[in-house]
């Protein structure tokens, strides 16, 4: 399997900077992208997969759906549209807004 290049992840994070709150974390050679504390996208094999939401689907219009990795649920595969900083920042913002808040971690007693 290929992994994602850090340079590609840094480029995407820069493209998404308009959201004001992008973070990413390396997981198994790939990256999870966070916006406002929610996982909004995965970057696998240098491809961007945005979590599917109704609002994101409406914004994209006719998204390409594909699993980020074998066995995963489908995500929205974003191919060249991330070259447009305003567009990708808006999609990430919409996705973060539409996703449920992260579940608080149960404290072990």
Where are these regions (language model features)?
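Charge-dense, helix-prone N-terminal extensions
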Residues: 1-109
